[in-house]
């Protein structure tokens, strides 16, 4: 009986050791699904290859089904790092108490959301009263939380102000809904809007921006708090070393819609936490 118990214990220890060894050799990375999965993977591939070179280890992109899945995976150490919106970071930080935001794009310190419509008669939110409206994901900082927060500050409660609100699930989907006439207006993050316009994926002769939110902090790359501090520091340095004057680096930065990456800290997202509490999205 004792020999069997020891054998089981040894087998468990070996399995655990192998798991930890595997985890140490592979950096598991994900991102909030604010765009189509194929687009997220396309944007990450060159960055992942760069990180592999800089870190000397395999980097694996792990897609997730929704925003809560990223929070849960980071909190349970099934992910090492993730690209998060400001609100998702707040959720992870409150859940774990130790998640670390490493870097953000330069523009994420002054991020905005764009209100769009295909109705030529809509010049402001006042013109959308009693009409239909779309947010992105309910957990999106730039596609839901912050636009909602600024609307509430202006005395607009979306649930009663609009005849119907919908959640498209992603910024590009919101633009598609508006262009197709599925809703009268919508809101999405400024970076995705600019990318869709540049790629010709939205008809600007039909869809227009009629308002922009005030600025707020948003996206960042966050690592789990239990990650080896030396590895976390290497990751941060790798991001900060991306130089737009280097053609290879610029290609990576362009896919991330970044001019460059800068350091960030948890305190930067206090305003987002306050907005989430004001909207009763945090208890």
Residue locations for each model-derived region?
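Bacterial N-terminal signal peptides
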Residues: 9-17
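Sec/Tat signal peptide C-region and signal peptidase I cleavage site
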Residues: 17-23
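An extracytoplasmic/periplasmic, membrane-proximal ligand-sensing/linker region
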Residues: 24-31, 35-46, 216-218, 222-283
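Extracytoplasmic small-molecule ligand-binding "clamshell" domains
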Residues: 24-88
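Short helices/loops that flank or line small-molecule/ion binding pockets
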Residues: 68-82, 95-96, 126-129, 170-191
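Hydrophobic/proline-rich hinge and linker segments of small-molecule sensing/allosteric domains
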Residues: 102-124, 221-224
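Flexible hinge/capping segments at coil-to-helix
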Residues: 117-137
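Pocket-lining segment of extracytoplasmic ligand-binding domains
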Residues: 131-230
